[in-house]
């Protein structure tokens, strides 16, 4: 293999693939490598991790002098390319070594036998007619994902459904992005008619998708089909710019959460988001940002009164003004960080809290941002 390639174009690809490569996985070392494949008219780059595989194709600003393929350490190769100043780079495979050359630089990198890492390349020669296709605006998708990402479980659950986002298009009229750790729930609605579908995508892949700033238009294509072998998984192929991403979603049943929003509240209050946010941040500072710190919240017709007590450090009382109040007074215990993450995902300043009582989950929403709804379970 021997190719001439523009350094800036190569650098852009490698920066993206660095988000795929895992450099310190001793159990699965092939996750730290990058496969470079030169064909007559293009160069393909492959990388994978335990969650998904990615292929990037470059067909411009290249000159393929000799076809071939080579596997190298991904992070090291990326850092070396980033440090080169010249615009044109020669990459050549020779005697199980990768030569990286410019007018002023000559680098030899050891390569790996391709037979040792058969899973680094996924089968992209599939008939897309066998797949259903979902086209969605990348900007709208990433906006929704960023708003609900905090609700995804940060623990590696025995069931993977809480380690990702559920794409719920089951009614064919909207797409609901749903995330939960079983204590908090966030749902973002995208108004778009589709054929019915439902699948879960791990946050590792969603973070990779969020890292893109599409150059070829704002649409992202997600092709999906249930695996015919067992119906226990759904195969996804995602096209974004010159990247093709392969992912297998395990068909676990995500809870039916939309019905949770349909209740008659006993108490409803309207508050300024930033006032509550500032109060919670002070409480968490006192609690030294303890993730599971609980505080008591008294809901009155004039204020939310939030009491917190940190052993051996101190105590605080925060009062947040109620702009509107309907219903009954109540006391409820909440996780301070979870409540902060929930309200901070809203862009609007006024938010509404809907309570069913002291021992039931409550709803957080905004009339100015109706596409986002969140639920928090009280703590005991």
UniProtKB/Swiss-Prot annotation:
InterPro entries: DNA_clamp_sf, DNA_polIII_beta, DNA_polIII_beta_C, DNA_polIII_beta_N. One of its GO terms (cellular component) is DNA polymerase III complex. One of its GO terms (biological process) is DNA strand elongation involved in DNA replication. It comes from the Bacteria. Belongs to the beta sliding clamp family. Forms a ring-shaped head-to-tail homodimer around DNA which binds and tethers DNA polymerases and other proteins to the DNA. The DNA replisome complex has a single clamp-loading complex (3 tau and 1 each of delta, delta', psi and chi subunits) which binds 3 Pol III cores (1 core on the leading strand and 2 on the lagging strand) each with a beta sliding clamp dimer. Additional proteins in the replisome are other copies of gamma, psi and chi, Ssb, DNA helicase and RNA primase. Keywords: Cytoplasm, DNA replication, DNA-binding, DNA-directed DNA polymerase, Nucleotidyltransferase, Transferase. GO terms for molecular function: 3'-5' exonuclease activity; DNA binding; DNA-directed DNA polymerase activity. It is found in: Cytoplasm. The gene is dnaN. Confers DNA tethering and processivity to DNA polymerases and other proteins. Acts as a clamp, forming a ring around DNA (a reaction catalyzed by the clamp-loading complex) which diffuses in an ATP-independent manner freely and bidirectionally along dsDNA. Initially characterized for its ability to contact the catalytic subunit of DNA polymerase III (Pol III), a complex, multichain enzyme responsible for most of the replicative synthesis in bacteria; Pol III exhibits 3'-5' exonuclease proofreading activity. The keyword Nucleotidyltransferase applies. Gene3D superfamilies: 3.70.10.10, DNA Polymerase III, subunit A, domain 2. This is Beta sliding clamp. Pfam families: DNA_pol3_beta (PF00712), DNA_pol3_beta_3 (PF02768). PANTHER family: BETA SLIDING CLAMP, DNA POLYMERASE III SUBUNIT BETA. Its main location: cytoplasm.
């Amino acid at each position: 293999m021997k190719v001439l390639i523009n350094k800036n174009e190569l650098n852009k690809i490698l920066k993206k693939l660095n988000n795929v490569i895992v450099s310190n996985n001793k159990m699965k070392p092939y996750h730290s490598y990058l496969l470079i494949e030169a064909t007559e008219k293009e160069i393909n780059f492959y990388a994978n991790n335990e969650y998904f595989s990615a292929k990037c194709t470059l067909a411009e600003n290249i000159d393929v002098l000799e076809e071939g393929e080579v596997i190298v350490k991904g992070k090291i190769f990326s850092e070396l390319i980033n440090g080169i100043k010249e615009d044109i780079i020669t990459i050549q495979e020779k005697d199980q070594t990768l030569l990286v050359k410019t007018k002023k630089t000559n680098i030899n990198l050891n390569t790996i036998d391709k037979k040792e890492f058969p899973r680094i390349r996924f089968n992209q020669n599939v008939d897309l007619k066998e797949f259903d296709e979902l086209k969605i605006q990348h900007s709208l998708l990433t906006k929704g994902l960023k708003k609900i990402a905090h609700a995804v479980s940060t623990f590696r659950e025995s069931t993977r459904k809480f380690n990702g986002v559920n794409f719920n298009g089951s009614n064919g009229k909207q797409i609901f992005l749903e995330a939960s750790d079983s204590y908090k729930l966030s749902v973002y609605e995208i108004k778009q008619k589709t054929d019915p579908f439902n699948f879960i995508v791990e946050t590792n892949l969603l973070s990779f998708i969020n890292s893109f700033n599409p150059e070829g238009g704002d649409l992202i294509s997600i092709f999906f089909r249930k695996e015919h072998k067992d119906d226990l998984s759904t195969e996804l192929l995602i096209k974004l710019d010159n990247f093709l991403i392969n992912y297998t979603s395990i068909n676990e049943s995500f809870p039916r959460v939309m019905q949770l929003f349909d209740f008659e509240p006993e108490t409803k209050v309207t508050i300024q988001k930033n006032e509550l946010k500032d109060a919670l941040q002070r409480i968490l500072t006192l609690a030294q940002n303890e993730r599971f710190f609980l505080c008591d919240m008294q809901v009155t017709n004039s204020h939310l009164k939030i009491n917190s007590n940190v052993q051996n450090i101190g105590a605080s009382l925060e009062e947040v003004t109620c702009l509107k109040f309907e219903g009954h007074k109540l006391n409820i215990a909440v996780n301070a960080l979870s409540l902060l993450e929930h309200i901070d995902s809203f862009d609007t300043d006024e938010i509404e809290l809907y309570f069913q009582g002291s021992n039931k989950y409550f709803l957080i929403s905004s009339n100015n941002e109706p596409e986002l709804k969140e639920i928090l379970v009280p703590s005991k």
